[in-house]
Design a protein with these regions (language model features):
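Alpha-helical scaffold segments that mediate packing/assembly in large oligomeric complexes
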Residues: 62-140
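Short loop/turn segments at secondary-structure transitions that flank enzyme active sites
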Residues: 71, 95, 150-152, 189, ...
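Extended, solvent-exposed, turn-rich assembly/linker loops in the middle of proteins
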Residues: 113-177
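Intrinsic-disorder-associated interaction segments
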Residues: 1-4, 8, 75, 124, ...
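Sequence/fold signature of self-assembling virion shell proteins
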Residues: 166-269
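Structural beta-strand/beta-sheet cores of well-ordered domains, especially the beta-sheet scaffolds
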Residues: 63, 140-142, 179, 240
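A glycine- and small-residue-enriched flexible loop/hinge signal that marks low-structured segments
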Residues: 48-73, 84-92, 101-104, 199-208, ...
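Assembly/oligomerization interface modules of large self-assembling protein complexes
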Residues: 1-65
Length: 269
């Protein structure tokens, strides 16, 4: 630091700032008095959820769908060609949205778990003990999210111990579960070249102070919540163009809403 006057100046400026008081979790402190006698003047306070609250900017996924007017005019039976192509386009955008909500460096869940909510496997493969520790880090865990190969690796560990996990009923469908918490497969969770991956556990919903999805409703030409289809006109080649856009993000309302089991070994393919 002695060799860099600019760095020394910036550090001195930072240390001289009047930073807001925080508790040991880094949350904005609430001023209070306790154990006093007589009639002292009580402190006043504003309740700030965080000393420096984060602002989320909605991400966007977009594409331009091109449909030749001849196709729309002549081949609309028995299926509406425009509607079918829009359906496929929307599905592709939703798939990309899911990938971004997991892997985006800014707001993706894999990159936004608190360091205290990240744990490593005990021996490599995902064992029942690992899943129990991941589960114990939060209240009201709603779901696990894991790569299909990670689920298979976990079941192998259960079988080797003579354990047979039950299933959970979700909207009339039976899905794998552990301790009554459903395990949903997700192929968008990355697998490294060393055949390792991660397993997520989360509490969801605004009322539960969990993980929530963010989107904007009331868009012009809205087709679904947070997704719009805007007609851009017809080109000189008689090709109709539609701008398909979806806006989204994700937020972890409190640190213990999301946990990640890291370095999960999948074994041999």
């Amino acid at each position: 630091m002695d060799s860099s006057p600019d760095l020394r100046t910036r550090i001195a400026e930072f240390l001289s700032q009047d930073l807001p008081a925080t508790n040991k979790q880094g949350e904005a402190a609430i001023a209070m008095a306790a154990g006093h006698e007589g009639e002292p003047e009580l402190p006043g306070t504003y309740v700030d959820y965080e000393a420096g609250p984060r602002e989320y900017e909605l991400a966007v996924a977009q594409t331009i769908l091109r449909v030749h007017t001849r196709v729309a005019d002549l081949y609309n039976g028995p299926m509406d060609q425009l509607e079918q192509q829009l359906r496929l386009t929307v599905e592709a955008l939703r798939e990309r949205q899911e990938w971004e909500m997991l892997n985006n460096r800014d707001f993706g869940l894999l990159h936004n778990a608190d360091s205290r909510q990240r744990i490593h496997t005990r021996s490599g493969p995902p064992t029942p003990n690992d899943m129990d520790e991941l589960l114990s880090r939060r209240r009201n865990t709603r779901l696990f999210l894991a790569h299909p190969r990670a689920i298979a690796a976990f079941f192998r560990e259960c079988n080797s111990r003579g354990l047979y996990p039950a299933s959970a009923d979700v909207d009339g469908h039976h899905v794998p579960a552990w301790r009554g918490v459903p395990i949903f497969p997700c192929g968008k969770i990355p697998v490294t070249d060393q055949a390792t991956t991660s397993i997520l556990a989360m509490r969801t919903g605004l009322e539960e102070q969990g993980v929530i999805a963010l989107h904007q409703t009331g868009l012009p030409d809205e087709r679904e919540p947070g997704l719009s289809v805007r007609f851009m006109g017809v080109s000189d080649q008689a090709i109709a163009r539609y701008l398909v856009s979806t806006y989204f993000s994700a937020a972890v309302l409190v640190p213990d809403a999301l946990g990640v089991l890291e370095n999960v070994e999948l074994g041999h393919a």
